[in-house]
A protein has these predicted regions:
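Short hydrophobic/Thr-rich beta-strand motif most characteristic of the beta2 strand and flanking loop
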Residues: 33-40, 48
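Charged docking surfaces used in two-component/phosphorelay signaling
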Residues: 23-31
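Active-site beta3 strand of CheY-like receiver
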Residues: 52-58
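C-terminal output helix
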Residues: 114-124
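Receiver (REC) domain active-site loop signature in two-component systems and cognate sites
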Residues: 63
C-alpha cells in the first residue's frame, strides 16, 4: 500500500496556538489525503475532540490557558480517547521535555519546525490500518 493510500481519509487534529503551524500542517496533511481538524488551544481541542474523533492528534506544548502537557493528560484520562495516539509538538528538544510528554501519555515527540516528511511519517506510524 502506498504512503498516500495509507493516509487517505485519516482524521488528524492539530492543536497549536500558532496559525502558521496549524496552516502548514493542514496543507501537508490535506495534500496527503488526510482530513484535518484545527484547534487553537487545549480548550478549543477538548470542545472539538468528541465531535470529530481524530485518529491521530498533534499537540503543541507551549500554549496559553491550557498547555500541551495539561491537554494531553486530559485527553489520555478520557476512557474514550486514551488510546488515540498523541504526538507532542515543540520547539524545545530537551530530554526533560520529552520525558514530561511521556509522563502525561504522549506517544511521540516531534520538534518544530517539522518537515512535511516528518509530519507524514508520524501520522503513518500511528494511522489505523484497514483490515
Amino acid at each position: 500500500m502506498t504512503e498516500a493510500a495509507k493516509l487517505s481519509g485519516v482524521k488528524v487534529m492539530i492543536i497549536d496556538d500558532s496559525n502558521t503551524i496549524r496552516r502548514s500542517a493542514e496543507i501537508f496533511l490535506v495534500q496527503a489525503g488526510c482530513q484535518v481538524v484545527l484547534a487553537e488551544d487545549g480548550f478549543d481541542a477538548l470542545a472539538k475532540i468528541a465531535d470529530h474523533q481524530p485518529a491521530v492528534i498533534f499537540c503543541d506544548i507551549m500554549m496559553p490557558r491550557l498547555d500541551g502537557y495539561q491537554t494531553c493528560a486530559l485527553i489520555k484520562k478520557n476512557q474514550r480517547f486514551r488510546n488515540t495516539p498523541l504526538i507532542m509538538l515543540s520547539s524545545k528538544d530537551g530530554l526533560f521535555d520529552r520525558a514530561r510528554g511521556r509522563m502525561v501519555g504522549s506517544d511521540q515527540y516531534l520538534t518544530k519546525p517539522f518537515t512535511k516528511d516528518s509530519l507524514l511519517q508520524a501520522v503513518a506510524t500511528f494511522a489505523p490500518t484497514s483490515p
